[in-house]
């Protein structure tokens, strides 16, 4: 098994790029340019090797066996929880809940905390730029409880209207659930300020960190949020696994979301008592391999350094905006002063799906569509955008290929 991520004193991203085998192949006869990182990041060889090692030599169920192999798997599984606690600077490893992803994490909070604490007329504040995963669960709970959804509007530049947000807050506000970085626009929202204002109003907060956790240092205690959610596959880990951070006192007051093995204390046909946090929220056989894979991904990202990653990606985004700005007819959707990873754009006479198809024929992978964010598409009066999303293993040559590909595609519509 290879050592955890190569440590490079002055980070050499050209060397790091070599650790991603998927990037070194051809698609449709062209070298692959992967610019769909907001949908899913790629996996370095270190993470793939760690998963392979687990499946070959450690595979066993956790928490339930006295034999050595089970104990070994359990140790690796629970070590992941501790690593993630440290990675996001949570106060207690028992505040880390393993889920199937960001969507599952939000549903857990909505159904466990929301169904317990919302009443008719209570208010949940979201933003106009939310991913559907941070809209639909709250709508479903609101329909059952009589709660009301309020929405923070977005300005023409793609930024939240914070003054409008302040006016939305009221004594009836029970939850403020906000995306940290927009997957459709790239906007970095001022979550620390949003959380502080919510707390002043007596509300609880949830931050959707799916697009922020791969791109910058996350300090939960500094942000001050009550809940924070993210997915493994956005940060070089396996799919089907995610994290819910929850403030321990809130988690301890919340009922279980699902029933089954491991989340119980005692079971009879008359009654069941539940396990302690975090296990009461982790019913059934957990995604053991995925947790170990994310643990390795955390080691990998930490070895590079999140500050170095943020610096590298900021330079690439600035370069992409500069080069794309020179393309006649291209219009950006979302031009916030603070943005990360995502560059979203349209052409008035070229549909995003047509552009994406032509780019794919040149080996360039981008995302087209509404990006599971239909409300923000309606806000900007567009049916879809083309989204190029950048990771630390991308380079200027990838951006140049994108620009060349767009100019080639334009020739079909002129």
Task: State each model region's role.
Residues 1-414:
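Pyridoxal 5′-phosphate
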């Amino acid at each position: 098994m290879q050592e955890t991520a190569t440590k490079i004193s002055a980070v050499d991203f050209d060397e790091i790029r070599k650790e991603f085998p998927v990037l070194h192949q051809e698609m449709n006869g062209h070298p692959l340019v992967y610019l769909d990182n907001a949908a899913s990041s790629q996996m370095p060889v270190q993470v793939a090797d760690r998963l392979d090692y687990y499946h070959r030599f450690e595979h066993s169920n956790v928490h339930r066996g006295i034999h050595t192999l089970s104990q070994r798997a359990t140790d690796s599984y629970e070590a992941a929880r501790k690593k993630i606690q440290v990675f996001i600077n949570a106060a207690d490893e028992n505040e880390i809940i393993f889920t199937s992803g960001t969507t599952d994490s939000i549903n857990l909070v909505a159904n466990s905390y929301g169904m317990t604490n919302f009443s008719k007329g209570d208010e949940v504040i979201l933003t106009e730029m939310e991913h559907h995963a941070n809209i639909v669960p709250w709508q479903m709970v609101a329909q059952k409880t009589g709660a009301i959804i309020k929405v923070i509007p977005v300005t023409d530049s793609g930024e939240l209207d914070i003054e409008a947000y302040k006016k939305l807050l009221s004594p009836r506000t029970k939850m403020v659930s906000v995306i940290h970085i927009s997957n459709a626009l790239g906007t970095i929202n001022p979550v620390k300020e949003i959380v502080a204002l919510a707390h002043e109003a007596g509300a609880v907060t949830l931050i959707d960190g799916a697009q922020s956790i791969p791109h910058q240092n996350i300090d939960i205690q500094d942000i001050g949020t009550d809940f924070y959610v993210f997915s493994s596959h956005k940060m070089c880990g396996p799919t089907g696994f995610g994290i819910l951070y929850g403030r321990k006192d809130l988690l301890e007051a919340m009922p279980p979301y699902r029933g089954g093995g491991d989340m119980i204390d005692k079971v009879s046909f008359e009654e069941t008592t539940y396990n302690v946090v975090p296990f009461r929220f982790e019913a059934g056989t957990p995604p053991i391999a995925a947790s170990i894979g994310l643990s390795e991904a955390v080691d990998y990202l930490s070895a590079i350094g999140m500050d170095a990653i943020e610096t590298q990606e900021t330079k690439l985004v600035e370069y992409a905006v500069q080069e794309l700005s020179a393309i006649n007819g291209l219009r950006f959707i979302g031009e916030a002063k603070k943005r990360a990873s995502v560059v979203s754009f349209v052409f008035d006479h070229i549909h995003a799906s047509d552009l994406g198809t032509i780019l794919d024929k040149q080996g360039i992978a981008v995302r087209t569509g509404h990006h599971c964010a239909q409300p923000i598409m309606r806000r900007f009066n567009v049916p879809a955008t083309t989204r190029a999303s950048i990771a630390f293993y991308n380079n200027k040559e990838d951006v140049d290929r994108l620009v060349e590909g767009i100019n080639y595609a334009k020739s079909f519509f002129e």
